[in-house]
């Protein structure tokens, strides 16, 4: 499969690209490759028996080398009399059928339709040095003459650096004439960027403009990009799309050259896309470890992230990837994330597919013939099974998928595709049913099963969920906050009223429902699609103790606060995300922590109750403001940071005299856990409530 790189936004900025052009200077116009570097594209688009016109031939050896391999019907023109004289003398006896003529390419003397190919190596670039009117008029005359002397079906093959203004002019001119436009990257030009002293800093392209017979009234325009020597051309919809595709190739080439010369460029990421569909297939992150002492075998490695685990901190966050690279012990580590919706046959096929591309990102100084290792967790690519995909009018596109963890256990995840790197909800599948599959699916799968796929896939039924297991660390901390209630050792026998805003997959309210038999829970969810997801895929169900209200949490609490006989809750939990990624606070939406609204929350909380809030805020100033606002309404405020995540769990109470010292708080957590650990009742042995509270701090 052909893989096309697409640079990340960091390398698409105007400032970055402008700086590059300032450093380029004029040297780039002076070299476009030898015959050996261009022969692949030349032989692809020129047949040996065709009549070829070379415009602006100069003293290049290109025509001579083409002649020597069988392309002998070649006419060369140049405006320089000195050059033409030199070339005639150099070729008169050895290449008698090749001619050299002094001629202005904007006023050629050949009859119409004299040639099948017009070959231009850098001449258009040399003429089109700016966009002044005089220059553009000269280029118009040149291109018009090219069109005149070419036969229908003939090609204008122009070797160019494809700077934006040159590409725009050439593509615009010939597409308006109804010609087919193709841009083909010269494969060897990428290698030149990795030389110790490259002769230019841009990849070389060939424009192949094919002359079609004019059709009156036809608006058909054909634009294609061929980004690899043997790759299939990709059809594009517009000249703008073609220009963008070329720009991405140039940016990628520049990125490769910079990575070759320098370490520690900062956060560098790019997508490798399916060459046929354009869909992202791999996401690469380049991580340098300057402190690693170089040796022969530790220069460069590739780490394949198992499918479905790209959201984990170690792989999904920059700090995590730095830790991974340091522990791996290589100067440069490239992490590779596999995309859902793509088929992968196994580690060997991925290695074969990626080898050429990742070597373009290698650092300088690697020993010759060094075998670059491909690493992974457990030596395989993991398992990801997409169980369901749909679109919610409120939350957008989402996916339900089952992924295999470290211990071969399966986990079900809800992911909003608007934020692919965040797991919205997660649940563990029960081991005894995690490998059941419907017979039809098994039968279909036997026809074609990729490597590293288990014989049986996880069952789709919601009943396969392990309801005793909390996957999310912030959910574990929120449950531990119930130890702040009076007499936690008696909570299983105490009627508890809880309000949970934000349902997601339903794991949090479901855990409370199953472990606190006297609890009565009201869950509020704005998106009806999420109730459907929780019910069908995460084992959630309503009962006389569990009611779900489809409503905006703001409206629901406001309405309760305005009731004369308003209810009072022992526990209120906010686990609700914001749909606006620009705010600096992704959980909860800012309106949920506004002073006026917090007063309403306070009015429906029992005097000794606890308000528990999942806060995700990267803006430190905004976070300080939120904490100050909470403190103004709830005098007692505990904060528990979730290690390796941005999440902070806030425990808010109404009376500061209820403040507990850490030893006292831990003792209450142990008492609650001892009560919850009942014989015959499922419990995760790794879940220790006191561990969730031992780093709690009072604000």
UniProtKB/Swiss-Prot annotation:
Its main location: cytoplasm. It comes from the Eukaryota. The modification Phosphoserine is found at residue 267. The keyword Transcription regulation does not apply. The modification N-acetylmethionine is found at residue 1. Residues 436-449 have a biased composition (Basic residues). Its EC number is 2.1.1.-. Keywords: Acetylation, Cytoplasm, Methyltransferase, Mitochondrion, Multifunctional enzyme, Nucleus, Phosphoprotein, Transferase. It is found in: Cytoplasm; Nucleus; Mitochondrion. It is an enzyme of class 2 (transferase). One of its GO terms (molecular function) is protein-lysine N-methyltransferase activity. GO terms for biological process: methylation. Gene3D superfamilies: Vaccinia Virus protein VP39. One of its GO terms (cellular component) is nucleus. It catalyses: L-lysyl-[protein] + S-adenosyl-L-methionine = N(6)-methyl-L-lysyl-[protein] + S-adenosyl-L-homocysteine + H(+); N(6)-methyl-L-lysyl-[protein] + S-adenosyl-L-methionine = N(6),N(6)-dimethyl-L-lysyl-[protein] + S-adenosyl-L-homocysteine + H(+); N-terminal glycyl-L-lysyl-L-glutamyl-[protein] + 3 S-adenosyl-L-methionine = N-terminal N,N,N-trimethyl-glycyl-L-lysyl-L-glutamyl-[protein] + 3 S-adenosyl-L-homocysteine + 3 H(+). Residues 433-460 are annotated as: Disordered. Forms a tripartite complex containing GAB1, METTL13 and SPRY2. Within the complex interacts with GAB1 and SPRY2. Dual methyltransferase that catalyzes methylation of elongation factor 1-alpha (EEF1A1 and EEF1A2) at two different positions, and is therefore involved in the regulation of mRNA translation. Via its C-terminus, methylates EEF1A1 and EEF1A2 at the N-terminal residue 'Gly-2'. Via its N-terminus dimethylates EEF1A1 and EEF1A2 at residue 'Lys-55'. Has no activity towards core histones H2A, H2B, H3 and H4. Belongs to the methyltransferase superfamily. This is eEF1A lysine and N-terminal methyltransferase. The lineage of its organism: Eukaryota, Metazoa, Chordata, Craniata, Vertebrata.
